[in-house]
């Protein structure tokens, strides 16, 4: 049985990934989450009946700090790391960018530093955003090799974390995969996220703000 780490497991994307792992793998899953306001506590993972699955281990930890030795020992031999944890509310990144950027960059650096010590790591998957490329001109489709053109501190923090991931792949030969996801929507999403917020504002007859060029 493979052992995997999923960061941000209580978040919107993270808990859907966790649900998929539970249903479609036999993995032992170690969930690392600091339980920020966007995590909704354990409500999301409680809704998918995680606490009755002995394969799932949940740890409350802040990845802005290096992993503690006790936790590292308990995690043991890890095969895959799925790094999903991040602050992602664009408006919050604009109103208070410093802690926002520090969280997303430092958490990625610390989980990478832990991961590079693992002797049997098969894959490190980092979940980034398409927003690192900025707004595309009409008729243009971006490719992975495009230059970053971050339009706000949120996308800049994800772009910086991507660069750190790439540097660890190049320097230490780590097996890193980076995904650039678009806006997501689904069950149990935080009401402050873009699509739920837009829907709510439209229903209330309010002005919709879109951060774009």
Located regions from the model:
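Glycine/proline-rich active-site loop of Rossmann-fold NAD(P)-dependent oxidoreductases
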Residues: 159, 177, 184-197, 204-206, ...
């Amino acid at each position: 049985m493979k052992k995997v780490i999923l960061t941000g497991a209580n978040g919107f994307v993270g808990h859907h990934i966790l649900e998929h792992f539970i249903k479609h793998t036999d993995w032992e899953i170690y969930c690392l989450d600091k339980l920020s306001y966007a995590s909704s506590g354990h409500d999301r993972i409680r809704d998918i009946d995680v606490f009755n699955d002995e394969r799932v281990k949940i740890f409350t930890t802040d990845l802005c700090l290096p992993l503690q030795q006790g936790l590292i020992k308990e995690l043991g031999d890890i095969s895959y790391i799925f790094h999903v944890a991040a602050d992602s509310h664009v408006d919050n990144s604009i109103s208070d960018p410093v802690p926002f950027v520090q969280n997303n960059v430092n958490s990625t650096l610390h989980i990478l530093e832990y991961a590079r010590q693992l002797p049997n790591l098969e894959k490190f998957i980092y979940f980034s955003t398409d927003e690192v490329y900025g707004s595309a001109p009409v008729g243009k489709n971006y490719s992975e090799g495009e230059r970053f053109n971050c339009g706000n501190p949120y996308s800049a923090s994800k772009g910086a974390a991507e660069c750190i991931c790439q540097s660890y792949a190049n320097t230490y030969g780590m097996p890193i995969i980076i995904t650039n996801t678009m806006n997501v929507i689904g069950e149990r999403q935080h009401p402050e996220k873009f699509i739920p917020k837009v829907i709510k504002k439209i229903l209330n007859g309010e002005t919709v703000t879109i951060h774009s060029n």
